[in-house]
């Protein structure tokens, strides 16, 4: 006969059953994070999205459209990672441009070396420096595979170091946001100040060939779009796995109450640092793919202003919903291009107004509005199908 305990004994940490596990360690995370059946994270939605995204190049009107959408898909990757940090972990990071820039510069350095014969320096080094051989910093980027690894590994490790330093000191909220923003500014200043190594404000340009393909060859933009689409699908799949895992529940519990998580025997600083590292890795991957898509890698692309815009994408789409982050990035950037083409001077005002309206009237973002509408329609259908007017389905059964 198995001994049992009441729910109160489990919740309040009563003495363990002889031979049983420690109740503090075994307290289910579901008590801290309510379970939900969220259609936005379903596998069916992922498969449908994958089919549409991968089929888009054949539907695009021209190659330029494919390149533009490839850029937006890279932004969506950043938004998904930021949603894990902010939406699920409660870490408002205003410096994701730092990790995006690290990935982009890593791939940009490789592409710069691809444009010149082996043993030859990039053109800007010959102009701004007296180097006679390739600097040590640039040598790992001669190989594509080492570049691909470093584009993800360097941002991840930097986020790990920064996260431990910050979260171990229990810095959070606006202080964490300001610190991450300051870190992004420092990164940009380093890029601008090292003219001999990074080409300063000019950035890395002149990518006429991309991984052996002519940049202006028909089909190159569609090929880059396919790479960006696969990258986004990988990021989404990983993100879904993370948020559904035990760690994902722990991350959400940390967001809601660090003290409770600490009582369960976990270190909130480690939990948050891992989430921050995941977001940085996704931003680094996005940057590595974005470099050939942009055709230029410049410090202005990774300053504090783009970092703030990344937060706007997640807020507009709906933080705490991965699909909302993707939707927000795509919708906001589509609106930017559309409005800027018609009224180039008005977009910044409209963007600010959009952000204010969302925060004031739709804090759940687009995804929250769609979810509430879906729930309202479901309830309406349930009432109409109920045999007794005003009775729910559960009461009718």
Residues of each region from the PLM?
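Transmembrane alpha-helices and adjacent helix-loop boundaries
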Residues: 2-397
């Amino acid at each position: 006969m198995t001994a049992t305990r009441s729910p109160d004994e489990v919740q309040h940490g009563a003495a363990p059953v002889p031979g049983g596990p420690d109740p503090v360690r075994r307290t289910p995370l579901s008590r801290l994070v309510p379970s939900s059946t969220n259609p936005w994270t379903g596998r069916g939605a992922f498969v449908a999205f994958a089919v549409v995204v991968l089929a888009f190049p054949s539907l695009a009107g021209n190659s330029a459209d494919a390149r533009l959408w490839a850029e937006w898909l890279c932004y969506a990757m950043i938004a998904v990672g930021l949603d894990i940090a902010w939406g699920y972990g409660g870490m408002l990071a205003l410096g994701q441009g730092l990790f995006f820039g690290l990935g982009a510069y890593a791939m940009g350095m490789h592409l710069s070396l691809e444009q010149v014969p082996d043993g030859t320096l990039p053109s800007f080094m010959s102009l701004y420096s007296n180097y006679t051989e390739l600097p040590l910093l640039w040598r790992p980027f001669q190989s594509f595979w080492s570049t691909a690894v470093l584009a993800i590994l360097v941002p991840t490790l930097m986020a790990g170091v920064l996260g431990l330093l910050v979260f171990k000191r229990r810095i959070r909220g606006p202080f964490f946001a300001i610190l991450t923003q300051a870190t992004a500014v420092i990164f940009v200043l380093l890029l601008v100040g090292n003219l001999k190594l990074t080409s300063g404000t000019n950035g890395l340009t002149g990518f006429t060939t991309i991984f052996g393909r002519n940049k202006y060859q028909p089909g190159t933009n569609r090929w880059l779009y396919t790479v960006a689409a696969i990258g986004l699908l990988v990021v989404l799949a990983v993100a879904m796995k993370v948020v559904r895992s035990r760690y994902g529940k722990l991350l959400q519990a940390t967001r809601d109450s660090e003290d409770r998580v600490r009582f369960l025997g976990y270190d909130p600083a480690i939990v948050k640092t891992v989430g921050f590292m995941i977001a940085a890795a996704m931003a680094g991957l996005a940057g590595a793919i974005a470099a050939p898509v942009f055709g230029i890698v410049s410090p202005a692309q990774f300053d504090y202003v783009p970092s703030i815009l990344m937060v706007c994408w997640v807020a507009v789409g709906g933080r705490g919903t991965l699909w909302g982050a993707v939707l927000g990035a795509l919708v906001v950037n589509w609106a930017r291009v559309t409005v800027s083409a018609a009224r180039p001077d008005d977009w910044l005002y409209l963007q600010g107004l959009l952000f204010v309206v969302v925060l004031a009237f739709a804090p759940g973002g687009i995804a929250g509005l769609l979810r509430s509408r879906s729930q309202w329609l479901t309830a309406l259908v349930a009432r109409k199908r109920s045999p007794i007017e005003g009775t729910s389905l559960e009461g009718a059964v």
